Amino acid sequence: MMNLIRYQLYRLLRSYSTYFTMLAIMGLNVMLVSMNAAFAYEFPEHGTVSYFNTFIFDTGAFLMLFGLWSVVFTTGEISNGFIKQIVPLVNNKVKIFLSNLVVCGIMYLLTCVVTFIGTTIASFIFVDGIKLGSMVDYGVVVFTEFFLHLAVASIGMTITYLIKNFFASIAAVFAVVSGMTSVIFPGLEYILKQITGDKDLCICSWCISLSSTQVSYSVVDYKLPLTEIIVLPIILFVLYSVIAGITIIKRDVK
């Protein structure tokens, strides 16, 4: 298992897509800071460095780019022959998925660090006298979004293993993360309401594209209890990880 993780880390650090994704996410958030600099003067209680660092989560851009990167990363191990060579040597194919998941988690944390540094510097450049704000709130956002982004990585890996076509996988992940597939939720919600009789039933928030923006927005603005905030991300993470694990076991991924 450790050898698999080391190899995947080697691929991560040698891949151009890794650095492109990091710089793209950081660049987008810096651009958002420059465009919303006046916000810090109008609402000083919210216009802080920690608040600006959540912008990239609010827009869903981090989630989108991370999901697309997971497809590129997974496609790479298939196209370079790594899967074909390693599967006969691994007694449990789930280890391949788990090693990928560990590396995706490292990629997420590295990207958060790079984005935080770039955004913090940009905040002090564009806004005079800006305050640091609550790092606890920002830490909670990063922590809860961690599970959502790994859930998206699981989706990306699952689709790539199933389709085995780069462009089709990119299109499928884009549809899921952008919320295009969320059109099924109202119909499913209506059916469940009829079955259960619960008129207050709401499953639209289970759409992963909506969950990402709701988590960061809730932490910073609504101050919801931590347990209430992290339940959905963890459930989605476990759900999609199980689906990905079953897929790699049942599917010929060579």
Annotated model-derived regions:
Residues 1-25:
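Aromatic- and glycine-rich beta-strand/loop motifs that create alpha-glucan
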Residues 8, 232-254:
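Junction motif at the cytosolic side of a transmembrane helix
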Residues 8, 90-92, 159, 165, ...:
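Generic structural signal for small/hydrophobic residues in well-ordered secondary structure
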Residues 11, 75, 86-88, 156, ...:
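Helix-capping/transition residues at the boundaries of transmembrane alpha-helices
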Residues 18-73, 97-174, 178-190, 212-233:
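Secretory targeting signals
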Residues 70-89, 93-94, 253:
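Transmembrane helix boundary and interhelical loop/hinge segments in multi-pass membrane proteins
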Residues 87-88, 93, 176, 191-194:
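Membrane interface segments of multi-pass transport proteins and intramembrane proteases
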Residues 185-212:
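Juxtamembrane non-transmembrane "cap" segments at the membrane-aqueous interface
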